[in-house]
UniProtKB/Swiss-Prot annotation:
PANTHER family: NON-SPECIFIC LIPID-TRANSFER PROTEIN 2-RELATED. The lineage of its organism: Eukaryota, Viridiplantae, Streptophyta, Embryophyta, Tracheophyta. InterPro entries: Bifun_inhib/LTP/seed_sf, Bifunc_inhib/LTP/seed_store, Plant_nsLTP. This is Non-specific lipid-transfer protein 1. Displays antioxidant and antiproliferative activity. Exhibits antiproliferative activity towards the breast cancer cell lines MDA-MB-231 (IC(50)= 52.93 uM) and MCF-7 (IC(50)= 44.76 uM). The keyword Transferase does not apply. Keywords: Disulfide bond, Lipid-binding, Transport. It comes from the Eukaryota. It comes from Carum carvi. Disulfide bonds join 4-51, 14-28, 29-74, 49-88. Signal peptide: none annotated. Belongs to the plant LTP family. The keyword Transport applies. It holds the Pfam family Tryp_alpha_amyl.
């Protein structure tokens, strides 16, 4: 089961990257990997997606295109879009 506290703490090292771009830190990429490892079922993916979306909404200056590029920059195949605008039920 995925809870948002876990997702938030996994993504917290990514906040400077998400707000400013550049290169994500190793800790940030470890967090992205951790979310991937938790997201093994459709329900888990949807829950993680909702947590990510809620977290993203707390940062009005978050750059959506930077957020969406995060899994690629970390070389993690994440099946969850990192965005404020995702329809999580469509996953």
């Amino acid at each position: 089961d995925i809870d948002c506290k876990t997702v938030d703490s996994a993504l917290s090292p990514c906040i400077p990257y998400l707000l400013g771009g550049g290169t994500p830190t190793t800790d940030c990429c470890k967090g992205v990997s951790a979310i991937k490892d938790m997201s093994t079922t459709t329900d888990n993916k949807r829950n993680a997606c909702k947590c990510v979306k809620t977290a993203a909404a707390r940062y009005p200056s978050l750059k959506d295109e930077v957020a969406q590029a995060l899994p690629d920059k970390c070389q993690v195949k994440l099946d969850i879009p990192i965005s404020r605008n995702t329809n999580c039920d469509a996953i």
